[in-house]
Curated annotation (Swiss-Prot):
GO terms for molecular function: translation elongation factor activity. The keyword Oxidoreductase does not apply. Transmembrane segments: none annotated. It holds the Pfam family EF1_GNE. NCBIfam families: aEF-1_beta (TIGR00489), PRK00435.1 (NF001670). Belongs to the EF-1-beta/EF-1-delta family. This is Elongation factor 1-beta. InterPro entries: eEF-1beta-like_sf, EF1B_bsu/dsu_GNE, Transl_elong_EF1B/ribsomal_bS6, Transl_elong_EF1B_B_arc.
Length: 88
């Protein structure tokens, strides 16, 4: 099996959420071997999505454990996989 890089779009619960604290929570929630980076994406009305890049095995489950772990956080409204690319 090979690895894939996936981008998860994480939508905070509200614009009032402390993004720096949320970024730290996300880093601590995702397996350190999988985590790559977090980028901010302005959505509108003060809401900023976080695009979280992870690298996972393309086997069974893939991004699902990370998606479920992030979705379980109170500060997060939704988690969506927006891109998946096989690494060479």
């Amino acid at each position: 099996m090979s690895d894939v890089a996936a981008i998860l779009k994480v939508m905070p619960e509200s614009p009032e959420i402390d993004l720096e604290a949320l970024k730290e929570t996300i880093k601590n929630t995702i397996d350190a071997d999988s985590f790559e980076r977090i980028e901010e994406e302005p959505i509108g009305f003060g809401l900023i999505a976080l695009n979280v890049t992870i690298v996972v095995d393309d086997g069974e489950g893939g991004t699902e454990p990370a998606e479920e772990a992030l979705a379980a956080l109170d500060e997060i409204q939704s988690v969506e996989v927006t891109d998946v690319r096989r690494l060479m």
